[in-house]
């Protein structure tokens, strides 16, 4: 309940991921937890958060990975021990299998944004744990359902912020964003000195008038 309340009050994506990891560590007897997120369709799912600051996040899961495809098609978390007997597992590259086996993966869960798989949670087994607890599957499912809604809201907010700061025609940052940055820099340098240089491009306005704003 505390997790649900806290996560619904923030639109900060990193905070949502950190809180999701924290509640899983508190409620389950597991090893390490990793979260991989996809920035854009077609791109790989890259490591962005973990329960340990020193854990290596320099890894990724390709969108074509059969395990990723399984998570896209299913709502429930994946029990890795059972998944090893599936057709999807057998169709994975040996390198992909080795990477997951080396981490002692025990569960994988999807973070959904509607029909899109926005992210993946990898949960590894604790070294002293002898068996899986299937009640944990339901717990993981409940946590990821709440986290998925929060992530969707955070991504929508981030998209709205980017659109508000970007010129629709040129794709460049607009005057509103310029004033935001100017205000931030002024606040950071209130006790010091700050200089602003404006550069004018010769005949730029004329070029826009002749060939159009998009071309300019």
Where are these regions (language model features)?
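Sensory-domain boundary capping and coupling elements
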Residues: 111-126, 150
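Acidic/proline- and glycine-rich, intrinsically disordered low-complexity segments
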Residues: 54-88
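Signal-transducing coupling segments at domain and membrane junctions
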Residues: 81-105
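A short, aliphatic-rich beta-strand micro-motif
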Residues: 104-112
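Regulatory loop-to-helix N-cap segments in sensory/regulatory domains
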Residues: 101, 124-141
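Helix-loop-beta substructure at the N-terminus of cytosolic sensory domains
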Residues: 9-46, 65
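Allosteric cytosolic regulatory segments
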Residues: 141-148
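Conserved nucleotide-binding and Mg2+-coordinating catalytic segments in signaling enzymes
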Residues: 5, 158-180, 199-215
